[in-house]
Every structure is written in structure tokens, then in C-alpha cells.
């Protein structure tokens, strides 16, 4: 009996050790599989977010902090559904949409998506131009050209060295963004009590209600919704139903949670910096004015880090936006063109705006209007497709997820209508 118990104990110990080693190996592999969501998350820390969050913090202090948190949670759900669609169906969102349409409708859908891609480029290129102007005192036009060129080089990294290296470069830029926008906390720390109060949903007059609607409505970016499905598919392929797919979906959920948490921290930091240092400053109507205010209140070093964060945001988001544009064209039209030509198509409007001396702040505002028009065309089909059992099989959305998805899709679409109205009337 003693010998048998000993053998049994040794057997259990061996199996336990093997299980532990297997779990550890799986965890290591899971960390290796992370990345697509970090690329998509760049859309949530672009120059448009900088302007919106800084403006909110400067006007209302900590009041809108809960809005930023809610917006990132809603965006996280949408991004997961997009990645899930790619893994389960083996199609990007543009490809899946195109198969539901006749040719004329598909062409029209592509035209609006292409306008969204161009509007995205305007925001990123203008933001990069402003950052280069702040850091190196070059003209806005030259700054825009440099931003476009660097973004093209980043895309060449993807084409020649693969998606994994591209993801690592973009993730590196994301952490530069984190440092750039959180460094001010080493000089001025936010009040924990005020932060807790800022997490309590409430408003302060009609203007705060409208601004909250604008923040949520401007958070979900259509190009990121299209892109994430393609990123997940390119990175993980189309796994067969079963253990492999379930594991990749778990990894994808972790990927989205981590990436959107980082994006949420950055957006929160933008608002808190403004709430602590820029309240009552009449400088937040344009990004360069925000830099000046930070320099006056926190010093040249923190202001420089802010500008570097803005530059990293612009470079990363410009390359990710161009990647999304190529994915959209390939998915909807079933054709692709060389990346250089593709990049020039979407880059030209942004460079033309800078060359003509158009006010960069107004260009950012107008680009957000165009982006707002594109939101329903990306989010509503996504929820419908991921709830299609014929397409998704056993991985179709849970009924609760479907209800929440439709609620988010309709809410974000309506809030973008509000955003358009507010922008036009102001």
C-alpha cells in the first residue's frame, strides 16, 4: 500500500509538473500572440483625441473623467467584435460587408469609406505638422510632408519585414505616447478625491452634456473598426472551430483589454493634465496653444515631452490610417494598388490643405465631421454580421452581447449626429 501511494503521489506530482509547464508555455505563447489590438488602439490616442480631451479638462476640470472611461469601454467592445469577426470568418470587415452587397452599393460604400480614410489622414498629418513645427520650428507644410514620408516608411516595414515587426514598432510608439502624456504627473499630481468625484456620472449645465456627447461620439474611429478584423486575420489566420479558435479568442480579449486600458490611461492623462494646469486658460482651441500653456505652467521639459507624445501619436496613427485605407480598398473592391500610390491618394488632400494655408485647427474639426459620417457604416454592419449564425456558427454573439452591441452601435451613431450638429453650429 505504501509503495502504491508513493507511486500515486509521484504520478500526481509528475502530472502536476507537466500541467504547470504546459500552462507556463501557453502563457508565454499567449503573450507572443498579443499585438493587433495595440495597433488598432493607436486610433484612440490620435491628435483628435488630444484636442477633445484637453479641451474637456480645461473647461470642466475632472467632471468629464467618467465620460472618457465609458467611451473607452464602449470602444473596447466594438474592437473585440471586429477582431472576432476576422478570426471566425476568415474575412476582414470590408470583405464581409462587400459579400452582402451588389456592385453599385459596394462601390458607393467604398467611396464613403475612402472619404473616411482621407479625413483620417487629414487629422494625423495636420497633427504631425503641428508637432514638427513645435519641436523643430519647420513650416507646417514641411512638417506634414515629413509626417507622410515617415508613415510610408513604417508601412514599408510591414510590407518587407512582416506584420509582427510593424506591430512592435507601433507598440513602441504607443509607449512613447504614454510617457509623453503622463510625464506631467511627476510635476503636478492629480487629486485622488477629485478623480473619484470625476468618475461619478453627472453634468454641469447644458454645455457639459453636449461636450460629453461629443467625446463619446468622437471616440470610436471607423477606420479602426475596419482595420482590427484584418489585423487579427493577418496575424492569426483563420483557425478551425475548436480549442485553437477558443484560445485565440481568449487571447484576443486579453489583447483588447490591455490595449484599450493603455489607450484609456492616455486619454485620462490628457484630460487630467488640462484639468490640473489649464483650467480657465483660453488657449485650448488649438494644440499649439495647449503646448504653450503647459510650458508656462509645468516648464519646458514637460511641454517638450507633450510635443514628443503628439509627434509619436501623429506618426503612428498616420501609418495605421493608411494601412486601414489599403485594407478597405482591397476588401470592398477586391483589388489592391501599390502602397506608394495608395499612400499618395489619401495624403494629397492633407498636404493640399497645409499648402493652401488653411487653418490647421479648422482642418482638424472638419475632418472629425467627415469621420462622424462614417461611424454608422462601420459599426452597425459589424454588430449585424457578428450576430449572423450562418456566418459565425457557434461563435455568434451571446444574446446579451448582441443587445449591448446594438445599444453601443446606435448610441455612438446618434452621438456622432450630435457631434456633427455641434461642430456645424459652433
Swiss-Prot record:
InterPro entries: NRAMP_fam (IPR001046). Belongs to the NRAMP family. Keywords: Cell membrane, Ion transport, Membrane, Symport, Transmembrane, Transmembrane helix, Transport. One of its GO terms (cellular component) is plasma membrane. GO terms for biological process: iron ion transmembrane transport. It is found in: Cell membrane. GO terms for molecular function: cadmium ion transmembrane transporter activity; manganese ion transmembrane transporter activity; metal ion binding; symporter activity. H(+)-stimulated, divalent metal cation uptake system. Its main location: membrane. It is a multi-pass membrane protein. The chain crosses the membrane at residues 31-51, 58-78, 134-156, 169-189, 208-228, 256-276, 298-318, 337-357, 363-383, 402-422. This is Divalent metal cation transporter MntH.
Amino acid at each position: 500500500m505504501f509503495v502504491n501511494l508513493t507511486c500515486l503521489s509521484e504520478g500526481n506530482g509528475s502530472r502536476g509538473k507537466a500541467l504547470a509547464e504546459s500552462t507556463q508555455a501557453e502563457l508565454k505563447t499567449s503573450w507572443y500572440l498579443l499585438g493587433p489590438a495595440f495597433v488598432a488602439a493607436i486610433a484612440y490616442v490620435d491628435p483628435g483625441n488630444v484636442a477633445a480631451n484637453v479641451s474637456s479638462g480645461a473647461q470642466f476640470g475632472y467632471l468629464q473623467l467618467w465620460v472618457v472611461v465609458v467611451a473607452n469601454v464602449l470602444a473596447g467592445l466594438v474592437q473585440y467584435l471586429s477582431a472576432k469577426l476576422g478570426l471566425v470568418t476568415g474575412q476582414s470587415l470590408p470583405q464581409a460587408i462587400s459579400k452582402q452587397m451588389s456592385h453599385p452599393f459596394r462601390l458607393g460604400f467604398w467611396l464613403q469609406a475612402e472619404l473616411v480614410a482621407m479625413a483620417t489622414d487629414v487629422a494625423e498629418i495636420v497633427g504631425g505638422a503641428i508637432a514638427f513645427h513645435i519641436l523643430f520650428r519647420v513650416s507646417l507644410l514641411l512638417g506634414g510632408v515629413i509626417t507622410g514620408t515617415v508613415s510610408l516608411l513604417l508601412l514599408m516595414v510591414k510590407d518587407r519585414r512582416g506584420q509582427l515587426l510593424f506591430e512592435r514598432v507601433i507598440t513602441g510608439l504607443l509607449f512613447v505616447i504614454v510617457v509623453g502624456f503622463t510625464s506631467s504627473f511627476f510635476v503636478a499630481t492629480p487629486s485622488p478625491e477629485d478623480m473619484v468625484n470625476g468618475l461619478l456620472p453627472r453634468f454641469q449645465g447644458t454645455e457639459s452634456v453636449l461636450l460629453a456627447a461629443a467625446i463619446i461620439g468622437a471616440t470610436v474611429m471607423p477606420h479602426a473598426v475596419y482595420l482590427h478584423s484584418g489585423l487579427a486575420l493577418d496575424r492569426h489566420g483563420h483557425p478551425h472551430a475548436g480549442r485553437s479558435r477558443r484560445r485565440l479568442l481568449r487571447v484576443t480579449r486579453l489583447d483588447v483589454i490591455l490595449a484599450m486600458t493603455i489607450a484609456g490611461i492616455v486619454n485620462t492623462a490628457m484630460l487630467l493634465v488640462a484639468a490640473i494646469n489649464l483650467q480657465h486658460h483660453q488657449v485650448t482651441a488649438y494644440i499649439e496653444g495647449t503646448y504653450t500653456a503647459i510650458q508656462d505652467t509645468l516648464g519646458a521639459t514637460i511641454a517638450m515631452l507633450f510635443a514628443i507624445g503628439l509627434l509619436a501619436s501623429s506618426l503612428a496613427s498616420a501609418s495605421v490610417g493608411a494601412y486601414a485605407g489599403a485594407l478597405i480598398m482591397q476588401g470592398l473592391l477586391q483589388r489592391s494598388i501599390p502602397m506608394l500610390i495608395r499612400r499618395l491618394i489619401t495624403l494629397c488632400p492633407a498636404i493640399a490643405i497645409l499648402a493652401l494655408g488653411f487653418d490647421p485647427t479648422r482642418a482638424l474639426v472638419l475632418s472629425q465631421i467627415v469621420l462622424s459620417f462614417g461611424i454608422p457604416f462601420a459599426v452597425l454592419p459589424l454588430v449585424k454580421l457578428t450576430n449572423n449564425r450562418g456566418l459565425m456558427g457557434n461563435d455568434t454573439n451571446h444574446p446579451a452581447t448582441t443587445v449591448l452591441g446594438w445599444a453601443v452601435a446606435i448610441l455612438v451613431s446618434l452621438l456622432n449626429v450630435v457631434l456633427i450638429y455641434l461642430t456645424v453650429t459652433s
